[in-house]
Amino acid sequence: MCPTCPPSAASASSENNNTDNNDHLVLSSDSSHPANLIPALCAKFWTLGWVTGTGGGASIRDNDLVYLAPSGVQKELMKPEDIYVLSLAAQATSPNPKQRVYLRSPANYKPSQCTPLFLAAFTKRNAGCCIHTHSHWAVLVTLLLERERSSKEGDEEKGKVFEINNIEQIKGFGRGFGKSGNLGYHDTLRIPVIENTAHEEDLTEFLEEAMDKYPDTYAVLVRRHGVYVWGENVHKAKTMCESLDYLFQLAVEMKQLGLPWITDIEPTIPTRK
């Protein structure tokens, strides 16, 4: 699925000023091509209420090429021609967003402010896909944790991580970066929470700190904002995002019923041999 090799990053101009716009990087009849997958994913996420009002986004890495949804586009109307493309390796020499070089830029949009956060998932976790949603269940979970933190004055860690165990859907998550297998039913899923900032790109350092502190996580919640989820490939990132949204909704409804997220349940051992 590797697209035609692009020209070097040095030969490409920045932002929307490309003289050769390299449209061949986003035009393909292959439905699994990143430039086709991102609009399809975003249209699906829009129907779920995850990316309303142009919020949220997605990015896919194919070897060195990174494909990104643009800023300000209505996600259900996105087309392959709207996709940005950049070289991941080139970012090491131009980390400043204002100097970021794109191999391919759409004419009518601006780069997503999520770009440095997506790049963090690719560089720090070798992810193949990163998804950002404004799921209202994710936001509600962060608000519940915020309320818990305010009621536990003096405990600085309260409200900074979402934890849940003994729920079947937890099996949808891997054990962590570089580890084999998935979490089990009795394991505890932990998703760190970072505080929101006025500008999306300013979240990057806090996202990276959360990755360092919780090396096994595949997601980071942003308080009053949404969630970032990444995976080895599109399939894993998508299914973990779906599993997380299920768990967030379940967690909110459990709180309404007075049920705890963390329980001590004895394993049921089969006796039949």
Swiss-Prot record:
It is an enzyme of class 4 (lyase). InterPro entries: Aldolase_II/adducin_N (IPR001303), Aldolase_II/adducin_N_sf (IPR036409), MethylthioRu-1-P_deHdtase_MtnB (IPR017714), Salvage_MtnB_euk (IPR027514). The gene is MDE1. SUPFAM superfamilies: AraD/HMP-PK domain-like (SSF53639). Its main location: cytoplasm. The active site is at E168 (proton donor/acceptor). Its EC number is 4.2.1.109. It comes from Sordaria macrospora (strain ATCC MYA-333 / DSM 997 / K(L3346) / K-hell). The lineage of its organism: Eukaryota, Fungi, Dikarya, Ascomycota, Pezizomycotina. This is Methylthioribulose-1-phosphate dehydratase.
